[in-house]
Every structure is written in C-alpha cells, then in structure tokens.
Amino acid sequence: MRCDGEVIIVGSGIAAMMSAYLLRKSFHVIMITKSDVFASNSFLAQGGIAAPIAEGDDWQAHTADTWKAGAAHGDETSIEMMTKHAVNMIELLDDLGVSFDREESGGYSLGLEGAHGTRRIVHVNGAETGKAVMRALWKAIKNEITLLDRTCVYRFIKNKDEIIGVETDQGSLFAPVTIVATGGCGQMYSVTSNGKEATGDGIALAYRSGAAISDVEFIQFHPTVYTGNEKEKGLLISEAVRGEGGQLITSAGERLQSLKSRDVVSREIFRQEREGHTVHLDLTGISDFERKFPALYKGFNKSDRRTLKPRVTPGAHFLNGGISVDAWGQTSLSRLYAVGEVACTGVHGANRLASNSLLEGLVFAHQAATHIQQTFQPLTAGLFVERDKAEPRSFKLPTREDLQKKMMRYVGIERHARSLWYMNNWFQPFLDTAHYNGPWPERDMFEQANMTLLASLITRSAAIRTESRGGHFRADYPNGLDKFQQLIIEWQNGAHMKRQRPTIKELSR
C-alpha cells in the first residue's frame, strides 16, 4: 500500500514538536499545521514550566499540588509519572539551548504561581517561556522532518478500527502512525487567551472517526485576561505576575485572594463583575515591572502602562479533557495517538495546576514516542478504506460570534440546568452538519463545525454532571458530590457512558 511517511503529526505546538524531535532519527516524520508553524498556544505560553527542581522540593509535593488543584479528579498514576519526569524535561530543554532565567548564583530563577506550595516554575524573560522553547525545538527538528504548513486536515482515513492517514485540503497522506497534537478549543468562547487556531479540530476529527473523548465539561478559565488593547485582544497576564506581588483589587477597593487555584479566582472575579464591579491587577508593588515582564508591558495600552493597574476578566484558557488516551498516548483507535491539550491524560483532573500544560505536552510526547519506537508496524497491502458518509443536503451552522457569546453566557464560568437545557435545544438544528466527516467546502466552515460539535458535547456533559468540581461549576449544584468523584463522562459514537477511574490512594502532602 502507498505510504507517504511513517509518522504523521497533526499540529505544531510543544507536544507536536517534542514528538517530532524524539522520532525524527528513527522515522520519516511529516508535520502538518493549518497555519504558521509558530501559530499555537504553546508559542503564546507565558508563565513557564513546573518542575520540582529547588532544594527541598520533590515530585511528591508537586504531585500533591497537582492532585489538589484538580479537585481529586486526576489520574494518580499519570500525575506521578509526569512529575517524576519534570526535571528531566527541563534538562533536555537546557541542552537544546533554552535560556531559562537564572539567579546570580547560577541556579534557576523559580517563580511562584497559584496553588503551588513552593516556587517551582522555570521561565524565560519573566513571561516568554513558550516562544523560547518552541524556537529551540523548531531549530532542532526543522531540517530533519517534512513540514506541510498552511495545510488543513479535514478527516482521518480509517481502516476498520485503525487510522492509516489523513485527508487534507491538499490531498490524502498515508502513514502507519498518526499523532494528533492540535491543542484546545478556546475560540468557542467570546473571551479567551487562546490563539485564533484553537477551534477544537483534533478532538472533532477523532470523535467523528469513532474515538472516545472524556472530561470535556472541565473548561479552565484563566482569571487574568487583558482586553484593553485591540491589537492584543485576549492577552493573558501570566500568573507569574501575581506570584511576584501583583494584587487583584476591585473597583470598590476590595482585595481578592490572588494566588488561589484558577477556578476559584475566576469565579470570584465573575461574581464581582455580576455585582457591577470591575477587577484590576495592581502591579505597582512589583519593582521594575517593565524590565521583568517586557512583553506584557508592551501589550498594555498607554493608560495601563502609566498606571500599572490594568483591568482583567476571566477567559477560556484550557480544556482539561479531550481525546481519551492511556499512559502512552494511545487513543481508542489503533495507530492514532493524542498528546498535549487535545488529549485527556487525566493529569489535570477537573482543573489544571498552573504551568503544568507545557510539562504535560513534553512528558506525554516522550511517552508516545517511546511506545511508537517499541511497537511500530508498517501498513500492509490491501487495506480497506472506509468511504465518506453522504454529504448533508445543506450546511447549517451558527455564526462564530453567536456561538462564542452563547457559550460564554450559558456554558461558561457558572452553569445551571436552565441554561444548559436552552443550549442543548439551540444546538439541535446544527448537529447534522457538525457531525459530518468531510470533505468540507472551506476551512472556516470546517472550524465552525468543529467548535459546534465540541460545544454541544461540553454542554451535554455539563448537564449530566450535577455537581460542582474544578472548572465545572453548577450554580444549582454548588457542591462536589462523592458519587461523582473520579466518575468520567465519556463520549463515543454519539452516546455517552460513565466509568469510574480506579483510585490507588489519596494523594496528600
């Protein structure tokens, strides 16, 4: 059978690039990205990478903080694996030339962020970590892989229960292994820190092909998104800023708790706004803010540069769930792996701990690459490729703006049975188009279908989970319930199931 490469990677964020870096010597790797190679949330990432690298810190403490932030919903085995590998990942990036900030003594300059028990965040130029890491990884792989940029994957090519390639707007490509690393879905909300490419493509592609997805009701809203500059709309003000002394203050002069977990701080700001107050981040207590956080300072408007008290609001930031995978990044479909934000590894539980996202991408790329190297099997001749389902008679989808506004209002920081029921009904006329498995007449329609499909599943999951936990808050069920602890809501082939994640032990400091 025709084979265009050995490993296809869909996406170009940190998980995609680390996968390519680890596989490039053993296989012909083809990386496909729908935009520029640096157009990813990884490139936008500010705060840094969490690693228990300081004297007195250890992986057990990092594990406990991760578990607690995740509202006791995380996969304990995966969390431990991630935290145990964290220091090795930092050392690897060091070897690749990433210039992490250091103290005069030569040790790492470690930041403190919300819900961490100690300083353990390595960073570059205060809040430019993503750019530095991505540039170093790209430099290491660019001459050893095939890049297809500005190429959109519209469909996974399926043979029975395995994925054997991808269909793009430039044609079909076949390979024995496909890794999906397309990131999250923040663009389905009207306020988000995510780049315009974050439209949930990978999850929708996998789901339409029959892969299981889980925990999608757990959306993390970052409490400090800056919208005061049209050119920098959705600029994230890193948690590192609050770790260095930035204080959240309301227009009424009330000081909020700045270093609680993200879900707690976001809900508090949301409630203040509902009561008619604005919330500002007072940066005047940080000496030499412009030097420590130059990119953030540059992103402020003139007034906020002068006062150093920018207004902030919560925005969609991270999807804690995604494509269901095991500890090796394997999905429920053979030959298909998922790594990074697109995957549900269980390490974040119901609410991600700050600066664990880049770490997850690095560690699980390593896991997937290791498994691929150990189990690689070439494609065999005579495979049967499933034909496309019939194209819908007409393509009917909501506008992006309408979807964003409704998701923010009804399936956002606070949810209620009434709002979820309303949204579930609102989605019904669009679902035939949203479930269609390509080919698509244009990219904008494809992205809108992906967001609509995923938004509908998020809404239905949020309705099923009649409790509050982490990034999922039900105003009509404001407390967590024991019967929902470690209960996973999983979707596959149009139906949902509830499964219990095995609990090994309760993690605590």
Curated annotation (Swiss-Prot):
Active-site residues, as the UniProt record annotates them: 262
Keyword presence, Oxidoreductase: yes
GO CC field: cytoplasm
Keyword terms: Cytoplasm, FAD, Flavoprotein, Nucleotide-binding, Oxidoreductase, Pyridine nucleotide biosynthesis
Co-factor remark: Binds 1 FAD per subunit.
One BP term from GO: 'de novo' NAD biosynthetic process from L-aspartate
Reactions that this protein is recorded to catalyse: L-aspartate + O2 = iminosuccinate + H2O2
Enzyme class: oxidoreductase
Keyword Nucleotide-binding tagged: yes
Protein location: Cytoplasm
Protein name: L-aspartate oxidase
Organism, scientific name: Halalkalibacterium halodurans (strain ATCC BAA-125 / DSM 18197 / FERM 7344 / JCM 9153 / C-125)
